[in-house]
Amino acid sequence: MGDTNFDQLLSDYRRAIDAWVAAIEAEEALANDDHSMVEMEKWDAAGLAVHDAEALAKKARDRYKSALRKKNYGF
């Protein structure tokens, strides 16, 4: 466990969170007064991007937390 790079894991987690926030903001920007099907589809696609970014952020968080648990608790 001595070779685990906690700074890198934390950095990966923070980048993933930033990407998730950016995806949320992009989705939010598409919620507008244009009620056309095209705009709705763009909004839906942005929602899928939010879902994907959330999944990546949670995986990065889990990798970081798992490494910390192994270091601090031995499991």
Q: Language-model segments: what does each one mean?
A:
Residues I17-L48:
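Short E/K-rich amphipathic alpha-helical oligomerization segments
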Residues A31-K42, K58-F75:
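Long amphipathic alpha-helical coiled-coil segments
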